[in-house]
């Protein structure tokens, strides 16, 4: 299944990556285009005949937004569905009171969650990136992996349908614009895939966005790979623009992807070269990943200095963004 993503040595991967970067689309017949143009013209003519020359197409629906930021305060949402994805991961769906409203979450941003444990003096706050589409009305989804001694993830996994959770936001991260970069690389570990998936989905659902995307995603076991089907579907649909490389610390015998931790040899092989113009590298994952790859952030508003593997490979601070 992962034959195209196997990390055997640097040279085969580099050849695959070069082909992905330079292969031209195959020529196609123009007949379907002419047919489509003709049918479009006919449709416009019939529309004007029945509704008049001054008629215009219906404007897109402007939906209310659940989260507006600023001084809005906390919004309580009811848990409506629970889907078990693996031994330690669930997809939780929280519904909006207004079933026609959208979340108001932007690319790339997150929501702050809050709950107060019984007997505790302070509430627990944690940011989460929704995995549902930003244009989806009626609800939002969180993919949550439970961590030992992680108070918020343990609370979320203990929740039952019809219970409520407090949200606030959105919390803006990186302001994405169509074709802002020619090529982006995403380096993720564990649940760090969620903001990456948010960005990937936005790029490929926009027909005007031609950005190339390379994903390097590390996990402990195969069951830990979050959003696996969604990522594979996108890679199969856009093979010339999206490549994903998976690594497992504890792979099964039949695993054909990368083994071990995200390392310098792999990144040197699959990432765009530092000298390439108009590129950006995004990093998100546990502290150990940041330490090894890019260095940690100082604060949510301070990216800190670039260090680790990316600095060793010759990238500069402006080429890297740490979620």
UniProtKB/Swiss-Prot annotation:
Membrane-crossing ranges are 30-46
Q: Which family is this protein grouped under?
A: Belongs to the flavoprotein pyridine nucleotide cytochrome reductase family.
Q: What's a single GO MF annotation on this record?
A: cytochrome-b5 reductase activity, acting on NAD(P)H
Provide the cofactor list for this protein.
FAD
- The FAD-binding FR-type domain covers 72-177
Q: Which organism is it from?
A: Aspergillus oryzae (strain ATCC 42149 / RIB 40) (Yellow koji mold)
Lineage of the species this protein comes from? Eukaryota, Fungi, Dikarya, Ascomycota, Pezizomycotina
Q: Where does FAD bind?
A: 180-215
Report if keyword Transmembrane is assigned. yes
Protein's recorded name: NADH-cytochrome b5 reductase 2
Annotated EC:
1.6.2.2
């Amino acid at each position: 299944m992962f034959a195209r993503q196997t990390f055997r040595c640097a040279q085969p991967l580099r050849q695959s990556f070069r082909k992905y970067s330079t292969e031209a689309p195959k020529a196609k017949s123009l007949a379907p285009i002419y047919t489509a143009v003709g049918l479009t013209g006919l449709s416009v003519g019939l529309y004007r005949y029945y509704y008049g020359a001054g008629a215009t197409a219906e404007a897109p629906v402007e939906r209310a937004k659940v989260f507006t930021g600023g001084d809005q305060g906390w919004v309580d949402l009811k848990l409506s569905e629970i889907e078990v994805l693996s031994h330690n991961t669930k997809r939780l769906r929280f519904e909006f009171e207004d079933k026609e409203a959208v979340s108001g979450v932007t690319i790339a941003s997150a929501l702050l969650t809050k709950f107060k444990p019984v007997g505790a003096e302070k509430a627990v706050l944690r940011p989460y990136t929704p995995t549902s589409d930003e244009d989806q009305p009626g609800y939002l989804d969180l993919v949550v992996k439970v961590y030992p001694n992680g108070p918020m993830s343990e609370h979320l996994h203990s929740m039952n349908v019809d219970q409520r959770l407090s949200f606030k936001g959105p919390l803006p991260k990186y302001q994405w614009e169509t074709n802002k970069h020619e090529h982006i690389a995403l380096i993720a570990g564990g649940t760090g895939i969620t903001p990456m998936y948010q960005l990937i989905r936005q790029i490929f659902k926009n027909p005007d966005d031609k950005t190339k995307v390379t994903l390097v995603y590390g996990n402990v076991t195969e069951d830990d790979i979050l959003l696996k089907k969604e990522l594979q579907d996108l890679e199969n649909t856009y093979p010339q623009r999206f490549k994903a490389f998976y690594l497992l610390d504890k792979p099964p015998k039949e695993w054909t992807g990368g083994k071990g931790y995200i390392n310098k040899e792999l990144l040197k092989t699959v990432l765009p070269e530092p000298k390439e113009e108009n590129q950006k590298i995004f990093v998100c994952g546990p502290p150990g990943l940041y330490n090894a790859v890019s260095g940690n952030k100082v604060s949510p508003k301070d990216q800190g200095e670039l260090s680790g593997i990316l600095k060793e490979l010759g990238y500069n601070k402006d080429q890297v963004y740490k979620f």
